[in-house]
Amino acid sequence: MKRRCVITGMGVVSPNGVGTPAFADASLEGRSGVRRISRFDSSAIEVQIAGEVSDFDELAWVEKKERKHVSRVLPFALCASSEALETAGIQATSLPLEERRRFGVIIGSGGGSSEFTEEQYRLYFHGQLSKMSLFCVPTGVMGSLSSELSVRFSLRGASHVITSGCTSSTDAMAYAMRQIESGRLDWVLTGGADAPISLGTVKGFILMGILTEKWNQAPEKGSRPFSKDRDGFVVGEGAWMFVLEEYEHAKARGATILAEVCGYGSTCEAYHRVKLKECGEEPARAIGLAMQQAGIGPEDVDYVNLHGTSTQLNDRIETRALKLALGEERARQVPMSALKSQIGHPQGACGAAGIAATILAMQHQQLPPTLNLDNADPECDLDYVPAAGRKKTIGHAVCNCIAFGSKNSALVLRNLM
């Protein structure tokens, strides 16, 4: 019998809400978490807004003496993971050893500890070696993030970080699904976390010309997916974590099942370091592969959570890809929305963010809206649920992601509630 994978716990640290209840209220009502940057002085640069997590106490999750040795992404991930385990009804450190050996940690992150590493270089080049962390190398490598979570929760299963750009957390959840399907693990702490709001990263994106520079005085209007006047994305941050569990295992312990992860597809266009190919064929094929594994057709898709970055190229081609994947007639019938309009772009964590929003949409039978879609683009002509959410029962949903380097990944969620 095929082993099925279900989500039994969820935790959130988001620019528009810390904790799942706060995130649910904000995302379903359409409240923006984009604000002026407070992490550093942005007054001298062209972009001064970000989807920044506010009212978050890092020292509630990392001791004061340890804070200089870790990145901001770690307290995000610890907070979201703790909530995910709690809502799943799991006291991880109290589990028997054999169960902890079958409990893995697989997290996606695009930048990991990049802001920590940037600070270490700043200290080094300013001759402040005494202020540098003794752990500048181990903390700075990508793989440290999953290890920190494994140590905190005493989980002895596979501990991996997946980093594939913006598809990182989608791919991490798929890898976790494969580990459970194959029988190697019974449950996995999985999802995504990123904290890329630093001067160096923001300046790098400015050099690429892919951030919006028009909305410093009205931050909440800056992320404008599918609107004709969109001119770039807004950097975001946060963590969205889940407990992924084998279905029979979850049933046996009486767990509440939030959704089934039933399909995954991933492709690469092999085209360009940053740009998408205009045809949209490979993003469409990734969606098709996910639907194929889930055993569903276009007529079964009730909602699509879009990548929707607010760049001219991405939004146009993602629209084209959905028409190819679902057929143009069906694509026009299926409601879709872009969470990045509310929170900005949290890089490798964005797939997990979209999955969290989709689960909440299933639970509440309420679609999250796409904000700031003020000017219709004739090349982006699908139903993006503009301005306000709407009631909708969701049986199956597609969660789509597109990354630098021509990567495309999609997951299908099934509502078992």
Model regions: which residues?
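ACP-dependent fatty acid/polyketide chain-elongation machinery
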Residues: 1-66, 88, 248-260, 356-371, ...
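Condensing-enzyme catalytic core mediating Claisen C-C bond formation in acyl metabolism
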Residues: 4-8, 31, 35-36, 218-294, ...
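Glycine-/small-residue-rich "gating" segment that lines the acyl/pantetheine channel
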Residues: 126-133, 174, 178, 195-252, ...
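Conserved beta-ketoacyl condensing-enzyme motif
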Residues: 7, 22, 28-164, 193-202, ...
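A glycine- and small-aliphatic-rich helix-loop capping segment at beta-alpha/alpha-beta transitions
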Residues: 21-28, 112-129, 179-182, 202-215, ...
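Active-site-proximal alpha-helical scaffold in enzymes
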Residues: 77-90, 142-145, 150-153, 159-194, ...
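Phosphate/pyrophosphate-binding loops at sites that engage ATP/ADP/AMP, CoA/4′-phosphopantetheine
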Residues: 84-99, 250-257, 286-303, 326-330
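Short glycine/threonine-rich loop-to-helix capping motif typified by GTGT followed
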Residues: 271-280, 309-326, 346-353, 383-386
